[in-house]
Amino acid sequence: MADDTASASEDATRSYYDTHDVDAFYDAVWGGEDIHTGIYTDEHEDVAIASRRTVERAADTVAGLLGKESTVLDLGAGYGGPARYLAERFGCRVVALNISEAQNERHRATNAERGLDGLIEVVTGSFHDIPFSDGQFDVVWSQEAFCHSSDRERLLGEAVRVLEPGGALVFTDLMAAEGASVEALRPAVSRLGVDALATVDFYRRTLTGLGLRRIDFDDHSGQLLHHYVCVTEETRRHRPELRNTISPAYLDSLLINLPLWVDAARREQLRWGVFHCRRA
Ligand SMILES: C[S@@+](CC[C@H](N)C(=O)[O-])C[C@H]1O[C@@H](n2cnc3c(N)ncnc32)[C@H](O)[C@@H]1O
């Protein structure tokens, strides 16, 4: 059971992702598969295509470790887009841990439709208390989930604990720029159920302290502005049909919150990219 700091953000996240409103929004705007920042190669590209490219790039960093005999743990697995990609590309087993049972139900159903339920196990639980024993996984993977944690030192400790020696931790996360004002970002960040984002320096320092080596950060911060402009425009474009599927209050709150992320990205107050490192 997580302590109070971690469990406050867990409750907020669970109730956020378990609502029908949030489910319908991610389905309409991201395609309900990958829900993280995209890497765009063309300004007219769909959010879903760019978001899939992020999975491909992150997977390239651990391709040498993955095959039919390996197992990946995906922390905060969402609807399972990354888990299915990894299982299909490498034939590896994936354990997908996620706190939202509503997402997990959809995740399991999609895996079964695609014949991937034999390779992917979907588990309900929190990355603050990973329900597996030490050193079990070849790769621990996560995309845009650590931003929901109010105890990131604890979750990183857990991620490293379950990684086998020589295994890799790879993750993407929304972060604050060094020196960005926590107060100024708070109105945007509050939608994630936390007070503040991590920084690149925090991750480097904490991962080093946990004994990880070859810590690399592929900096794609320049993608954030375009991504949030696209997501905001898509939300506005889908507004008429979203009005029929999600509550007006949630839609209005999104249309207030998303432009705050656009503004923060424009002011270069945010960072984003792919971290990858190895356990000694
Ligand atoms: C923005 S979504 C990203 C989903 C997925 N990783 C992807 O990229 O498509 C964030 C995910 O983190 C999960 N999450 C947040 N806090 C969590 C926690 N404490 N333990 C496990 N999962 C958590 C949410 O339920 C959600 O699925």
Show which residues each predicted segment covers:
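Class I SAM-dependent methyltransferase SAM/SAH-binding core
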Residues: 71-73, 81-129
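A short acidic, Gly/Pro-enriched loop at the edge of an enzyme's catalytic core
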Residues: 128-139
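N-terminal auxiliary segments of SAM/dcSAM-dependent transferases
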Residues: 1-26
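Short alpha-helix
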Residues: 195-211
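Conserved alpha-helix/loop element of class I SAM-dependent methyltransferases that forms part
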Residues: 32-39, 45-68
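Conserved Class I S-adenosyl-L-methionine
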Residues: 216-280
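Short, glycine-/aromatic-enriched active-site segment of Class I SAM-dependent methyltransferases
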Residues: 174-195
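A short glycine-rich, Lys/Arg-flanked "PGG" loop and its adjoining helix->strand segment in the class I
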Residues: 153-168
